[in-house]
Amino acid sequence: MSDFKKLQVWQKAHALSLTIDRICKRIRGSQYASLRSQLFRAAMSIPANIAEGRRKNSDKDFARFLGYALSSCSEVEYHLIVARDTKVISDSDFVSAISQTITVRKMLYGLLNRLSVPEDDGKVKGSKVRKSPQPKAGPPTAPSR
């Protein structure tokens, strides 16, 4: 696999992690230490999982790590909402970070769709459409009474 730093999604995720780092440094108060830590760790996890997955030997493994990165995007989004609602970050910091998070999430979904790695349940990773089960052969049976 090629160098993860060349992936646009990794570059955007890395930029997001730096934005979150700057935001976390401005969150004050010991009562917010857990929120600060979780937000920071979730943000750092996104580019880390992209990088780790890119080094794997198969698209299936890469897709699995992209799924982890997507989960971390959701976690970042939630922690940002909490930080905004508790007034520990500014509205402008929230808007900037949430916009970057949404961009990264869309890019991850796009990359997953291009990989088209089937999951065990017949769903293509990252898609919203499941494969339809094949109808059983044979005549329909009458309902029993």
Regions found by a protein language model. Give the residues of each.
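Short, C-terminally biased terminal segments at protein or domain edges
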Residues: M1-R145
